[in-house]
Amino acid sequence: MNQTTETDSMRINLQRTYKDAINALNSLQSNFASIEATKKLGPSVNRNELSINEVHEFTKRLGYTPTDFNKLNIIHITGTKGKGSTCAFTESILKQYTISKIGLYTSPHLKSVRERIRINGQPINQEKFAKYFFEVWDKFTTTKSDPQECPTLQPCDQVKPMYFKYLTILSFHVFLQEGVDTAIYEVGVGGTYDSTNIIDKPTVTGISALGIDHTFMLGNNIASITENKTGIFKKGVPAFVSRQLEYPETHELIEKRAKQLGVSSLEFVDTEDLPNVKLGLSGEFQKQNAALAIRIANSHLKTIGITQDLPEFNNNDGKIKKLSNKFIKGLENVDWPGRCQIINNNPTGITWYIDGAHTIESINASSTWFKQEQIKLEKPKRRALLFNQQGRENYAELLEKLFNVTYGTGSEPQIKFDDVIFTTNTTWSSGQFNSELISKNTSEDAVKKLEVQNNLSEVWRKLDGGVSKRHVFADIETAVNYLKDLGDKDLQVFVCGSLHLVGGFLVVLDNERD
């Protein structure tokens, strides 16, 4: 199993500072070699079942049972595209009501790992993160698992959960200790075997748009992915699912799984125009996520006994008849950096369009959003693309999708780039990462040789016939400085691809060095 043991060289002199917590957490990351080995094995029910059982065991060693988590009144959301935005919309709506503490657990983070564990919209502070992190760390060091029941967790005092699993367990501990009374959980990968799926009785479950991703864990077809995602359905709990416009064939399987798992109700949610609402997240596709969040929040509020100031729905088709002012305010005030985010960077005059996207479906949505924003502009502008997809085997296919959407076909408007830049996710020109942006799951050799970036540059040359100026940089800081040095007051820059790129870009833009 993917666990980590503390060898003598890895033993960390734990001084109980936030920086020490980050260093300890980073020691739990899977390295590139172990991830590649897992990919070659393909999906494994036995391995996945073992993984989720280990989460149960680790929480047991902390002194918790699955029913303890029911106190959190958990909303559980999965999907391939839009699950994070749906969580953000849901949180923003609920903040308008008299809920004392709302927890939000999401992944990945952009700039700081504390973004993953929020209370009332704010990441927990460094002091609390370190405090709770080491409470969990010490408990795992001083407790034991039955070697017959948990042979993979031996020796108990050395084995810790890997990075994401540890953070998930930590989030449960934080929320319970902090007295959170509503918690929103975004699934990491899939559903059935995800670390978050130890939840016994959520108040409601939701699934956003489905697509092909994480195939080495979930299978390489939409049916197996749907089977896994629907694993968050729970007996007696309502389920809301975005209507799957790209994969309508999944509806029958979703209905079958809902029946198998005994949900109290299942509703497919259509995208709706909300004429009196200006969503806080731009992009036409966010209407779908907002519509799903409206149903999830409405259901949750009723479950916890809040029945005033809720939306009204039509009896015949279930569509929204009237939104309450609180729902409107929540939808308009949502804040979710790095997703369809626009930053006007004075005094340089550069406008940055930022969106993390790593699947064909999300690249399509992201590129469409950027294109629509550019079409609105009155006169032609100079444009640049900043792109990376490290660790994605289909990076060329993703770049080709971006090109096809922005450049268009036939009579479609064409949005072309004057400069195209490919960079690694390395933060600084010194070759260093900010400590909270370190990722061990890519090949160091490939990063040093700029293999992916040079390949992407060649792919683009073939796509546009060598018209754009192409640049390959070893780090994000150098790429950003190049764009700033262009001196074009109307430069429009599309920052797209890996969320690791987006997070590093935001750190560089704000010059937030460790």
From Swiss-Prot:
The residues that hold Mg(2+) 2 are H214
Supply one GO molecular-function term: ATP binding
Please list the cofactors this protein needs.
a monovalent cation
What are the annotated GO cellular component locations?
cytosol; mitochondrial inner membrane; mitochondrial matrix
Which PROSITE patterns is this protein grouped with?
Answer: FOLYLPOLYGLU_SYNT_1 (PS01011), FOLYLPOLYGLU_SYNT_2 (PS01012)
Give the record's cofactor note, including how many are bound. Answer: A monovalent cation.
Q: Which residues bind Mg(2+) 1?
A: S107, E186
> Quick one: which residues bind ATP?
G82, K83, G84, S85, R339, D355
Q: NCBIfam families annotated for this entry? A: folC
Q: Which family does it belong to?
A: Belongs to the folylpolyglutamate synthase family.
**UniProt name for this protein:** Folylpolyglutamate synthase
- The source organism is Candida albicans
